[in-house]
């Protein structure tokens, strides 16, 4: 999930969701002929179709390698609750790079026609985030709906999480 920090006085979950949810994507990874599939959330971070996600979303745990087939689903104009309708905007994805240690993966949507059509989630300065700041998360919980919204607060900041240099994380009460 992607969490978007917001100043407390500007914290309007409905407005933030309306302005950013189209830059949130559903990602699936699978192997031909297998029923098991990985599912997770990603964020479009550039107008030419680069998507940031977690490495565990694109790794086949049985093989310890990235899935050969990666798909990205874009958010429809309106979420219906019907899986087929809500996942009709499907594109192939190319794995650009990943780090299992940092649990990050960079994908690229394989369709030039989507450039500049969707909002981009922009990065901001993480040094401006403080414990107690409100956040929202938009994503696809394992046993939940698609493009869901949850709110919470930053509860902790952890540097070098898991003793991995550079893996700095915020703990939130969002899910």
Q: Over which residues does each language-model region extend?
A:
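N-terminal activation segment of mature serine protease catalytic domains
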Residues: 4-55, 94, 102-105
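Active-site substrate-binding loop(s) of clan PA
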Residues: 16, 61, 94-96, 112-145
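Extracellular/periplasmic catalytic domains that process cell-envelope and extracellular macromolecules
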Residues: 16-20, 44-45, 85-87, 97-101, ...
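Active-site region of chymotrypsin-like
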Residues: 20-35, 110-120, 147-175
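Active-site-proximal beta-strands of protease catalytic cores
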Residues: 23-28, 50-55, 128-141, 172-175
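Solvent-exposed loop/turn segments at secondary-structure junctions
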Residues: 31-34, 51, 57-59, 100-102, ...
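Catalytic-histidine neighborhood of serine endopeptidases
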Residues: 46-101, 111
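Beta-strand/loop subdomains of soluble extracytoplasmic proteins
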Residues: 69, 82-94, 131-134, 147-159
């Amino acid at each position: 999930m992607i969490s978007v920090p917001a100043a407390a006085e500007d914290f309007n979950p409905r407005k933030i969701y309306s302005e950013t949810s189209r830059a949130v994507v559903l990602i699936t990874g699978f192997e031909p002929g297998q029923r098991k599939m990985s599912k997770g959330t990603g964020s479009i971070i550039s107008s030419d179709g680069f998507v940031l996600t977690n490495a565990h979303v694109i790794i086949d745990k049985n093989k310890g390698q990235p899935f050969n087939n990666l798909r990205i689903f874009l958010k429809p104009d309106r979420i219906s609750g019907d899986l087929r309708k809500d996942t009709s905007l499907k594109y192939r994805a190319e794995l650009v790079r990943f780090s299992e240690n940092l649990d990050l993966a960079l994908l690229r949507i394989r369709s030039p026609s989507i450039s500049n059509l969707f909002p981009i989630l922009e990065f901001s300065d993480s040094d401006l985030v403080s414990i107690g700041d409100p956040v929202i998360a938009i994503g696809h919980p394992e046993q939940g709906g698609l493009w869901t919204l949850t709110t919470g607060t930053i509860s902790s900041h952890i540097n070098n999480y898991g003793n991995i240099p550079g893996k700095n994380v915020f703990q939130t009460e969002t899910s």
